Amino acid sequence: VKCTNKNKKQTQNSYDAARRRKALRKRRRRQQQIVTVLVILILCLTAIGIAYLIHSGSKKDYVIDYETKNYNKSLYKGDTFAKDLCVTSNNVSLEGYADDDSLGAAGLFDIKNNTVLYADNIHTQLYPASTTKVMTAYVALKYGNLDDIVTISENAVNLDADAQVCGFEAGDQVSMYDLMNGLLLYSGNDAALAIAEHVGGSVEAFVQKMNEEAKALGATNTNFVNPHGLHDPQQYTTAYDLYLMFNACSKNPTFIDIISQKSYSATITSADGDQWTTEWIPTNYYSAGEATPPEGVNVLGGKTGTTDEAGSCVILYNQDMESNPYISVIMGADTKTILYDDMTALLAVGVGTKSSKN
């Protein structure tokens, strides 16, 4: 019996020891698993940290490099770009001036104080007609040479019979300066094509440059497909974009000198060597003496545009009695009478009253 009890006790002890060893192995496995997980976690965190530092450093270097190269360019120029411009995203009323709902758009801009005095639908896309030639002039003045002598091509005179033209014939030779006068004063479509071919190498290349320069000026709601403004459904702008382009042109004294003239005599040399002269009268009624500016307002000049689709349009450079500059624009009037009646009323209230108070 004693032997049996002893055997039972030994058996129990062996069982208990085995259970303890099993439990110990189990704990060790758990500990090893925990250690393994912790090691993996530490390695992962270390790798993430290293990657972050590398990425952060390269990103910082990239940002610094980008800022160094692009400061005062693109988005960095936003504040500077708008600082010298009249800016509004909404309509602006002008006390004393009654809105004309029949117009496509209208605006009056105080250039000295960078203030929008009046705005009605100035961000609405409309057909520009020959106000297109404002951008044609901008590109020509920027990239062309006014002393160049240009030979008129067959393409430049290949226009519909009812198109406004200066009267050139293929083979005629005329200076770039004369062409600019024909473009801006008389709104010659043949002058626009001749300028585009000479300055751009081709009409297509010149129009591409027009679009590039328009975007650079902030005229992002504008698209050109030709340099003259004869109707094309893919050619459009806004009254505000037109202000931006005209305002840029007005910084060039030559542009102001040309549009301020009451007439211009051009000298043309024909293909056979004969010379002849022609006189161009401005198409805007104020400069031509067919409309009278309001008291206290001096209309220096501007650019007109008229097609069936665009209606009657005009953009003007004006001064008050203190010679402070203003740009006024009306697009989409049903008739020229309405166009100039509304423009006179707008200038009288927005500019003339300021002069009377000085």
Model regions and ranges:
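Domain-terminus/edge residues, biased toward the C-terminal soluble/receptor-binding domains
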Residues: A219-T220, P233-Y236, Y240-D241, F246-N358
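Active-site-adjacent loops and short helices of periplasmic peptidoglycan-processing enzymes
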Residues: G57-Y240, C249-S250
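Catalytic-site microenvironment of enzymes
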Residues: Q33-I34, D110
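Hydrophobic membrane-insertion alpha-helices, especially the h-region
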Residues: V37-A51
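N-terminal Lys/Arg-rich, disordered targeting/topogenic segments
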Residues: V1-Q33
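Hydrophobic single-pass membrane-insertion segments
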Residues: G49-V63, V351
